[in-house]
């Protein structure tokens, strides 16, 4: 299967290992470790032969980190994952089944078995749905239909970057789907080690305010 996994991490610890272990070793994984910790890079690449851990020159955030990884992708498809996501059985295979059904798409998203959805019941309704936007914890990218927009806007360090991307894709009539038959587990709010909870909370609050301001200025 023509796929590369992309994960952006910042001292994600055991959470990241749990994510990697849910991915079949035959798929290459590019990890952007935004903490720029050489020991983490060495540890990951030693434990997992399919992992290429890249240390950027500075913390690039979610958008910049993903863009750096996506610039290295040579496959036709990429699966963007948060570190706090675990793939359910046959998840990747089901992405390709759906990709062969909808063909000309930009993004396909799964559902998280932990989350509720406003417009449908993912347990009862398994039909593929075209949607306006998806949540960024897991996104299956059709690379040829996203390269034109340069993927994420680097001005979003954290938050709203996937909403912005989906909005730009829709303006070019690029389709976005969610498929309830594709399932992951998303343990939201736990993408880093507990020791840095307080500074990470302060950082998240600041970036939420900035991203909200920038998004509204950009699109209104």
State where each predicted segment sits.
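Conserved donor NDP-sugar-binding/catalytic core segment of glycosyltransferases
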Residues: 85-120
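A conserved acidic beta->alpha catalytic loop
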Residues: 22, 33-42
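Active-site-adjacent helix/loop segment of glycosyltransferases
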Residues: 167-220
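Glycine-rich, basic loop-to-helix element that forms the pyrophosphate-binding segment
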Residues: 55-73
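Short, well-formed alpha-helical segments that are part of the catalytic scaffolds
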Residues: 7-25
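Short beta-strand/loop segment that forms part of the nucleotide-sugar
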Residues: 26-36, 54-56
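A short, conserved alpha-helix in the catalytic core of glycosyltransferases
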Residues: 138-141, 145-185, 190
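Short aromatic/hydrophobic "clamp" motif used to bind/position activated sugar donors
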Residues: 78
């Amino acid at each position: 299967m023509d796929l590369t996994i992309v994960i952006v991490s910042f001292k994600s610890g055991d959470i990241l290992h749990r994510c990697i272990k849910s991915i079949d070793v035959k798929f290459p994984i590019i990890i952007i470790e935004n903490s720029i910790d050489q020991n983490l890079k060495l540890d990951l690449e030693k434990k997992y032969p399919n992992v290429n851990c890249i240390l950027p020159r500075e913390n690039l955030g979610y958008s910049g980190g993903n863009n750096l990884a996506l610039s290295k992708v040579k496959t036709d498809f990429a699966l963007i994952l948060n570190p706090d996501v675990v793939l359910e059985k046959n998840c990747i295979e089901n992405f390709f089944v759906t990709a062969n059904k909808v063909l000309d798409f930009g993004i396909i998203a799964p559902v998280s078995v932990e989350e509720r959805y406003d417009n449908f019941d993912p347990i009862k309704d398994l039909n593929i749905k075209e949607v306006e936007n998806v949540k960024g914890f897991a996104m299956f990218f059709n690379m040829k239909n996203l390269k034109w927009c340069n993927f994420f806007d680097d001005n979003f360090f954290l938050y709203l970057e996937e909403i912005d991307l989906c909005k730009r894709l829709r303006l070019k009539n690029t389709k976005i789907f969610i498929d309830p038959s594709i399932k992951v587990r998303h343990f939201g709010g736990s993408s880093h080690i507990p020791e840095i909870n307080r500074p990470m909370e302060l950082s998240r609050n600041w970036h939420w305010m900035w991203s909200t301001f920038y998004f509204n200025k950009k699109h209104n």
